[in-house]
């Protein structure tokens, strides 16, 4: 019996759930050459995205491939299951997150310089929900903490790396609001820091 390789890949992604499957592992499962595997994955990403009869999409996040629920379908299913979808980011958090993403890693004082307001409450919340993390200390006077975005940031915003961020013309201009719409997957640090600066 001939088995379609895309069906095998789909099943592997389904079983892996939220964790996804590393590209090397998935290639091994598919038994394809590197070139053929990359071509098949590009096809699957395109097909899942464009097919209106599919409720899922395939995405590459870092080195992993994962299945996600399409945003419009996610809302319907969430409503059916009684799951409330809520955007946890206010405008200040969005601006702080964007500054960190475009200037990573950066210190609290650097964020303050760009936003002209104390970023502490925003940082604490972003760390709590897992979008920002500490990245060591700066060599500047006082050795303040450095902050960077987390893998969850790339996951939620569908980015492979920082290079995939949209370009902005001038850092002084207000950074365009990012759309935070966490896709529910139906498969199955916070720390106190008052002495940063």
UniProtKB/Swiss-Prot annotation:
Superkingdom classification of source: Bacteria
Disulfide bonds: none
Keywords for this protein: Cell cycle, Cell division, Chromosome partition, Cytoplasm
One of the Pfam families matching this protein, by short name: SMC_ScpB
GO biological process assignments: cell division; chromosome separation; DNA replication
Entry GO CC: cytoplasm
Cellular location(s): Cytoplasm
Functional description taken from the UniProt entry: Participates in chromosomal partition during cell division. May act via the formation of a condensin-like complex containing Smc and ScpA that pull DNA away from mid-cell into both cell halves.
Known partners and oligomeric status: Homodimer. Homodimerization may be required to stabilize the binding of ScpA to the Smc head domains. Component of a cohesin-like complex composed of ScpA, ScpB and the Smc homodimer, in which ScpA and ScpB bind to the head domain of Smc. The presence of the three proteins is required for the association of the complex with DNA.
Protein family: Belongs to the ScpB family.
Protein name stated in the entry: Segregation and condensation protein B
Organism, as annotated: Malacoplasma penetrans (strain HF-2) (Mycoplasma penetrans)
């Amino acid at each position: 019996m001939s088995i379609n390789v895309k069906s095998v890949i789909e099943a592997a992604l389904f079983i892996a759930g939220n964790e996804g499957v590393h590209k090397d592992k998935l290639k091994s499962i598919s038994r394809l050459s590197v070139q053929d595997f990359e071509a098949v994955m590009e096809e699957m990403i395109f097909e899942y995205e464009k097919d209106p009869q599919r409720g899922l999409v395939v995405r590459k996040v870092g080195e992993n491939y994962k299945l996600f629920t399409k945003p419009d379908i996610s809302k319907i299913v969430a409503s059916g299951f009684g799951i409330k979808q809520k955007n946890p980011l206010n405008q200040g958090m969005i601006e702080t997150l964007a500054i960190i993403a475009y200037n990573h890693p950066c210190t609290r004082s650097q964020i303050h310089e760009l936003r002209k307001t104390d970023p502490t409450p925003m940082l604490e919340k972003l760390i709590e929900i897992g979008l920002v993390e500490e990245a060591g200390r700066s060599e500047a006077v006082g050795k303040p903490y450095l902050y960077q975005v987390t893998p969850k940031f790339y996951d939620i915003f569908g980015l492979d790396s920082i290079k995939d961020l949209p370009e902005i013309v001038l850092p002084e201009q207000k950074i365009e609001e990012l759309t935070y719409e966490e896709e529910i997957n139906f498969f199955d640090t916070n720390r106190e820091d008052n002495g940063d600066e």
